[in-house]
Curated annotation (Swiss-Prot):
Name of this protein: GTPase Der
Keyword GTP-binding applies: yes
Function in brief: GTPase that plays an essential role in the late steps of ribosome biogenesis.
Organism expressing this protein natively: Bordetella pertussis (strain Tohama I / ATCC BAA-589 / NCTC 13251)
SUPFAM superfamilies: P-loop containing nucleoside triphosphate hydrolases
């Protein structure tokens, strides 16, 4: 299996990493903008230059010398992302100039063994190339590239240089996807932050079963896949926890890699997101969940270590989940103990149901009838003198299901009405566990005046 190249954005706080990240991933962000509660502080996303897709990681404000607590854990994960990324873009600030923090990060990059590092000098708009980049040669990371993340100057050239020579994954013809559907094979990624219990759950699922593995070590774009069967259903487990072989049996060891997590999500068609019941729902949980939603993967949520909580603690974690991850309201949620095997069997039933929903075939007549019933019960609101008129609906894609609605003045449909329609379609077609996307196509735009 070949993965998309990974670009890691590194730099001290306030140099423009988030602005660059948003510009690189803006075409994807629009797909999830209407999901209530989805964090806008995204750290992982998909980008594309020409025909080349890639993944982007914003490593956040990097404090390489942090020794304790959450900053130290973030620094450790950033160092791992630097080592595993295909290319690192080190962002500095043209207007602030070089400082000691930049030198510290440059030193770390040189020691990391990462062969592909591009030095991007941001906020260079209105400055001559020499003025913008001159001081940054002293960082010893090659020729600086002046850019403006805010204005878009130099971004395409920067990413084309970053990706040059990297082997992009072959275009998806859909043949393998169709074969997986015919075989009823589910590609399952079990994801979650460190020590959430991924390894325990994987070992519980695999048991002592002898499995077929496709082990392709090499670059970070290679994956380990494990095939197994349960109750006559075929699954392919895509490794994120770190699987090691003992004889003919695989054992999972707890390990966390942001990049391997994102790549496994990309390669899967169902994601099992694990949350630790004995810890707060973290920003990292929300970032991973947001990326799952962005990629359109079906998802099941497993809250692990549930057996160790009293009733008050259980209520607290449920409230916290609803508050921080309410954009995953379509997903089935399970409480489990991976260690004791409690609740694991129903988990796979929900995985199967989410997969079926993601690949559901929705007939045009039935979609249109449901659309008309929804509009009759609650018409879309007017915008000015125009009321959106919805004529018919058809399916535009699977995994996730895409419903295309045709009519007039549909540019005026608010997000609240889109969510109303989504709920109607979900209930009518039993689409639990999968994102559902709705696209409006107007036959004409009444807001454009003809000359």
């Amino acid at each position: 299996m070949s993965f998309k190249p990974v670009v890691a954005l590194v730099g001290r706080p306030n140099v423009g990493k988030s602005t660059l990240f948003n510009r690189l991933t803006r075409s994807r962000a629009a797909l999830v903008a209407d999901f209530s509660g989805l964090t806008r502080d995204r750290h992982y996303g998909e980008g594309r230059v020409g025909d080349t897709p890639f993944l982007v990681i914003d490593t956040g404000g990097f404090e390489p010398v942090a020794k304790d607590g959450i900053l130290a854990e973030m620094a450790r994960q950033t160092r791992q992302a630097i080592a595993e990324a295909d290319v690192v873009v080190f962002l500095v600030d043209a207007r602030a100039g070089v400082n000691a923090h930049d030198h510290e990060i440059a030193r770390l990059l040189r020691k990391s063994g990462q062969q592909r590092v591009l030095l991007a000098v941001n906020k260079a708009e209105g400055m001559g190339v020499g003025n913008a980049t001159g001081d940054f040669h002293e960082l010893g990371l090659g020729e600086p590239h002046p850019i403006s993340a805010a204005h878009g100057d130099g971004i395409v050239d920067l990413i084309e240089i970053a990706l040059s020579g990297l082997v992009a994954p072959p275009a998806d013809t859909g043949e393998q996807l169709e074969q997986d559907v015919v075989d009823h094979r589910i590609k399952l990624a079990i994801v979650g932050r460190p020590n959430v219990g991924k390894s325990t759950l994987i070992n519980t699922l695999l048991g002592e079963e002898r499995v077929i593995a496709f082990d392709m070590p090499g670059t970070t774009r290679d994956a380990i896949e494990i095939d197994f069967e349960r109750d006559g259903r075929k699954y392919t487990l895509i490794d994120t926890a770190g699987l090691r072989k003992r004889g003919k049996v695989f054992e999972a060891i707890e390990k966390f890699s942001v990049i391997k997590t994102l790549q496994a999500i990309e390669a899967s068609n169902v994601v099992l997101l694990m949350i630790d019941a004995q810890a707060e729902v973290s920003e990292q949980d929300a970032h991973i969940a947001g990326f799952v939603l962005e990629t359109g993967r079906a998802v099941v949520v497993a809250i692990n270590k549930w057996d160790g909580l009293d009733s008050d603690q259980r209520e607290r974690i449920e409230r916290e989940f609803q508050r921080k991850l309410r954009f995953l309201g379509f997903a089935r949620m399970h409480t489990i103990s991976a260690l004791k095997g409690q609740g694991v069997k129903p988990l796979l039933k929900s995985v199967n149901a989410a997969h079926a929903a993601a690949f559901a075939k929705l007939s045009t007549p039935r979609l249109t009838r449901e659309l008309q019933a929804a509009v009759e019960q609650q018409p879309p609101p007017r915008k000015g003198i125009f009321r959106p008129k919805m004529r018919y609906a058809h399916q535009g894609g699977q995994n996730p299901p895409l419903i295309v609605i045709h009519g007039n003045a549909l540019d005026a449909v608010p997000d609240s009405y889109r969510r109303y329609l989504e709920t109607r379609f979900r209930n009518a077609f039993d689409l639990a566990g999968t994102p559902l996307r709705i696209e409006f196509k107007s036959s004409r735009n009444p807001y454009v005046q003809e000359n």
